[in-house]
Amino acid sequence: MSRTSLEVKAKRKPKFSARAYNRCPLCGRPRAFLRQFGICRICFRNMALRGELPGVRKSSW
């Protein structure tokens, strides 16, 4: 199935609540979703490196 049809399918209310899952609204990725930010890890990293997420910066120790 195409990614857009899978995004539409994920938005529908599932028959059982355990079947519900999150997708990244930017790229549609179903895995590695960060609930706190509502995006996937790859989009999170790209946005953090560009400085688009306030209060987030690359760690260094």
From Swiss-Prot:
GO terms for biological process: translation. Keywords: Metal-binding, Ribonucleoprotein, Ribosomal protein, RNA-binding, rRNA-binding, Zinc. The keyword Ligase does not apply. Zn(2+) binds at residues 24, 27, 40, 43. Belongs to the universal ribosomal protein uS14 family. Zinc-binding uS14 subfamily. Binds 16S rRNA, required for the assembly of 30S particles and may also be responsible for determining the conformation of the 16S rRNA at the A site. PANTHER family: 30S RIBOSOMAL PROTEIN S14, SMALL RIBOSOMAL SUBUNIT PROTEIN US14M. This is Small ribosomal subunit protein uS14. The lineage of its organism: Bacteria, Pseudomonadati, Thermodesulfobacteriota, Desulfovibrionia, Desulfovibrionales.
